[in-house]
């Protein structure tokens, strides 16, 4: 999920408006008074179907709670693919899995880490994705990544890691979020904390550089030297949240500890107090397994060989449930397709609903789709991408397509003002080169647009998913769970998306490919090939 875009010129349509929320979780109220700017009966049917008979709560509960995280190559991702195909079939929508490659298969089991000396305490933490298992509980002493003066000194130190857990992350000087410090600290205290953090960041960066080993492969180097395991902490700068990513280690388990737990262990080791950890990690490597996108289609009636594509990535990191990144996007895609099947069973153009896989490893599923289907690119009217977390859609960049603003202006003028009035268009915008799946189409010259959440605490328009502190508290974290979803906003996003897809499907002509004049030194992004196996991974 990308967190920002460049703003060049913004066409403001109007400001925020809020719909009445569901009376209780899992239910929706009847459509409240709304402003339909046209007499189009399909728009009214979409509204009624999406508001009065919404299924977003049920879809979200199954995806986030029952299926859970959807790490590429995991059984969870495979279950999600199979379930969505079956659910589409229940709605009478043609759907299938389309293989685009293979990936390293891995299944997470139970993981646990305890401090057993100099005192006993269970520590908050979990194994990294694709971490090797232990053969039962493993106890070992702890050492800190050496503050070696150069790579030669680092190589001389390496034998000391044999049989030990190695701490490889910088400890935080304190585990309070910055806004908490700024709110409560005296000016002199705030200045001290900020300066300590600045110095600590610079010193640790130098320590890493002095090893002569790239940060991404450091765990593998320590593993080769006989480390019992790797301990890190990727704090997300908020209360109780860490980013949980993967590892390429093949023997030594890799654990992420909370900010507080990591700081405790680090200080004990730093002060010569000889901490000992007991680590237990269960996991199964499943070999190289096939990976799929889920593709659904509502065939067009008049121009079936032209397409409107609605997509969002289905895969997630597995530190939690992958709710806001991007379970909400997957729910919005499926619910919009359900609504469209009920309200527009015979659209003018073929509508494709795509649940992409492998986005978190480099947009691999969508890049493969673009590479595998060159025949549809010139006949695709528009691509909509849903990967914005939670909150109402309030900002849509036009991605450098000269005609896009006119199309979006026309579509938004025909949807209820409760939706249109909250949307700001960036005209003409600039093409994004990565971040989420619409970029796979942009580089090929296909008009593709990603929805964004807008206003933050002060009400300013923003291009990032900051409305609910997403970048700190849910984006790739151990707290990205079902309870973070704002369901009335997700309902409204799915309904508005269905309306935009319907209106685009009925346009007389497909959107022109004319591009804005790029600023000096800027180029239209070039397409990158997908990684079709874990061996080809570029992340």
Ranges and model annotations:
Residues 40-42, 117-118, 122-155, 239, ...:
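Soluble metallo-hydrolase cores and metallopeptidase-like ectodomains found primarily
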Residues 200-212, 216-219, 223-224, 229, ...:
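Active-site-adjacent substrate-binding region
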Residues 24-77, 86, 179, 298-300, ...:
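N-terminal hydrophobic or amphipathic helices/low-complexity stretches enriched
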Residues 8-20:
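Bacterial N-terminal signal peptides
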Residues 118-122, 135-142, 149, 159, ...:
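Metal-dependent peptidase/peptidase-like ectodomains
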Residues 30-41, 61, 65-198:
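Noncatalytic luminal/extracellular "stalk/propeptide" segments of secretory-pathway proteins
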Residues 34-74, 100, 110, 237-247, ...:
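N-terminal capping segment at the start of a domain
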